[in-house]
Amino acid sequence: MEHERGGGGRGRGRGRGGGRGGGGGDGRGGGYGGAGGGGVGGRGGRGPPGGGGGRGYEPGGGRGYGGGGGGGGRGYGGGGGGGGYESGGGRGYGGGGRGYESGGGRGPGGGGRGHESGGGGGRGGNVWAQPGRGRGGAPAPAPAPAPAARRIQDEGAARSSGTVERIASTEVVRVQPPAPPVAVSRSGTRVPMRRPDGGGSVSKAKVKLLVNHFIVKYRQASTVFHYDIDIKLDISSPKASDKELSKGDFLTVKDELFKDESFRRLSSAVAYDGKRNLFTCAELPDGLFRVKVRSRTYIVSVEFKKKLPLSQLSELPVPREVLQGLDVIVREASSWRKIIIGQGFYSQGRSVPIGPDVVALKGTQQTLKCTQKGLILCVDYSVMPFRKAGPVLDLVQKSVRYLDYRTTLNKHQLDTLKNELKGQRVTVNHRRTKQKYIVKGLTDKPASQITFVDSESGQTKKLLDYYSQQYGKVIEYQMLPCLDLSKSKDKQNYVPIELCDLLEGQRYPKASLNRNSDKTLKEMALIPASSRKEEILELVNADDGPCRGEIAQQFGISLDVQMMEVTGRTLPPPSLKLGTSSGQPPKFNIDQPNCQWNLTRKRLAEGGVLQCWGVVDFSADSGQYALNGNMFIDKIVRKCCDLGVQMNRNPCIVQLLDMEVLSDPHQLFEELNKAKQAAASKKQKLQLLFCPMSDQHPGYKTLKLICETQLGIQTQCFLSFLANKQQGQDQYMSNLALKINGKIGGSNIQLFGESLPRISGAPYMFIGADVNHPSPGNVESPSIAAVVASVDQGASKYVPRIRAQPHRCEVIQHLGDMCKELIGVFEKRNRVKPQRIIYFRDGVSDGQFDMVLNEELADMEKAIKTKDYSPTITVIVAKKRHHTRLFPKDLNQQQTKNGNVLPGTVVDTGVVDPAAYDFYLCSHNGLIGTSRPTHYYSLLDEHGFASDDLQKLVYNLCFVFARCTKPVSLATPVYYADLAAYRGRLYYEGMMMSQPPPSSAASASSASSSGAGASDFRSFPALHEDLVDNMFFI
């Protein structure tokens, strides 16, 4: 129960007295104590005592220069081992040995500093060895021993609820050593290519732009000190448990440590990432410390790792650890009075109410990066919804309609409340405490029926009686469930809802916003480019803006508050190929600045044939929202025929259903199969079904699953009330016709060979790849990988392959097999294999470039290359999840209607990577909000693209997206891969919806994420053979 009790375990360490040695001569501070005993599980030295203390965190440690000496380990020669917590090790000549878990000398001839063991040997020892730095010195008197405990009593010290004491490793019952470094991906032979030239020069016009990048100023001569801080519960303390410590626990313990007089002078000059990395502008005392915070005791190891000179920021490539260290410092210097969510910093002083229990906070998204103009901080405007702080009971009353405290909640109400409250942070109001809890869930029973066994008396007590007797609280809403605030499985902590309060600063799920709140939030977020620029500048110049305050001053960093200015270029659009009619030439030139075109009196490049089609109308019983069927059929047939699609004017089947059918997977299958069989009875093959719906419905997922994996029917779903509208109806029908033609094998728009520089002289293929991951709260569902490939000369027809793979696996498994299949389709259609392949990869971070080159590309080459077939390959990564924005510098320069840069705006100097081959391209006409350019990286190029050629190729590929008559924001191969992966996600969710609900016992033991219990990705459905090579996903 909430009055938690518990006992810690006892640990025993065995040690035998070791040899004695003096303090370090000619060293810094001698040591922390006299030479002495063995470490945990260790034994005393076997060799003769050395001259000086080795560096360790137990008696015998120190920084003296001199021979081995004392301290926990096994010295087999020269002066004995210098044991100590995790590293220890003498720094003089000789030594080696084994300390607590690891150890090892640092001197020539000594063992290496190792993980789990040191070991003797020559210079360097094992793989973790570091060179020795000691030199011989005369023995010196041992320093006085440190006090056993030091209570903070200095009048100038901050108030503390605990104690900090330095301890020896022999006093630690159990502290696990740090895990060895783990590589993110397999190391390979390939690295991302460097920029081949100074950037492109081709353009319609050059434009002056402002970019939301701000120069970070720092002192070149400064040095940052990197420490590893390891915080664990002391299991010998009464409140010890096996629970994993939270980030809040780490921060609390770190703050308590820096109230101690040994650390307090640097309390305003420290940056901590909340995990293992701590950065300061001066040296810290290192060693083991026992820190007491309230009723818990922690063991804290502070170990020096490395000096990081900021002068290295001007080197190329910039050392990763220096950039990571400065990133932590900048985050710390930007967090004053802020709520931090990921890379976002939100100010409570800039809140706007958008609903009864939700506010929107304005803030920034910040990213530190190196560019050609130096170290910059990218600052973007951001809006995030947050819950209002207050009683949990208020939230319950708003979430549950017709709440009656005299009756229990029904299942629907209970599920609604669980979804609202799970994961929320609360505090209790029946006792004076600042302790915070995370809601694990709700009890199945109401508070009036909950009992527990008292740990002291062994008697069964009612929960309500406990709160009445212990705290004098009479629970009014006895029929409501309790919040489960348990921190471990063996200690239940159920608290009545009315005794809990929501903490401030908690993110509100966007999916839970009502329609009005969602609309208001979008209006705040999707502001015009000029307004976004002003918001960013206001946030950067604010008193609590980035890189402000004492921490920034201590580290000597500041921010130039002016946006960076760069020169961009506007690329010319390509010539497009349309269909011919009435003697029209097939070549079509775009002359509009916004690069849009219309299809009035024009035909599609290749019209498909739609002979057998039908209508399954789910809106038939929806009253005023029901489809006007006759009008729709007349309009869509006429539009398709005008555009060159050979469409039968009469449907072969029409079925009138209601929306409820979508909620029953079995009935839905029967109705759809009935349509297929009706066509078969007429000796026809059903190609496409129109499926109007009166509203968005989850059954859409099941419909796609059934038609595309079981029946082999393509579908075109749409909202009936939009098709009925007279205003804009012609454009709506045109948009439907574009999708229909693509699905039935037609081609809407094509590129000429001249629009594909350096590859059009031989058969070529564009491949796009992406991985769709489950939502953040989902811990079991598989990730969905999709690969698409072009199979025609006009780069407009694509074939997909979709696979499920393990949960959150980013590397595309079986990429080689999928590419081999796609090349086989290409060869079947063109009677030749592609000799040139352009591989576009979406959704990977900078740190995963090695994975793309040395895992995915290697898998592809292994599968497709043979003695007789070896195509050349270019690898391009497309990134949309960044916060760089481009703004026209002058209001009078040419721009879109809402102030965005024109389509085709490219930037490849100044704000790009100082070494990589990258560029920003804004290829679309942003109609709402501020346009986000796509950031392209070329990782490998076997075709020798110059910057102009590559930028032209990528931009031109944005014009062949089948669903619209304008360039899109992402190269079409990548866009299609994203759509195909999302379609695979719909299949999986539809499959979960079609399964019978689990039993109560099974559901109680399963995870609460969507799709729980169905993480076996091998059961993912395969596409129907009739659709496997079609563009059904557009």
From Swiss-Prot:
Residues 688-989 form the Piwi domain. Pfam families: ArgoL1, ArgoN, PAZ, Piwi. The lineage of its organism: Eukaryota, Viridiplantae, Streptophyta, Embryophyta, Tracheophyta. The gene is AGO2. Keywords: RNA-mediated gene silencing. Residues 1-201 are annotated as: Disordered. Residues 18-125 have a biased composition (Gly residues). One of its GO terms (molecular function) is RNA endonuclease activity. It comes from Oryza sativa subsp. japonica (Rice). Probably involved in the RNA silencing pathway. May bind to short RNAs such as microRNAs (miRNAs) or short interfering RNAs (siRNAs), and represses the translation of mRNAs which are complementary to them. It comes from the Eukaryota. This is Protein argonaute 2. Belongs to the argonaute family. Ago subfamily.
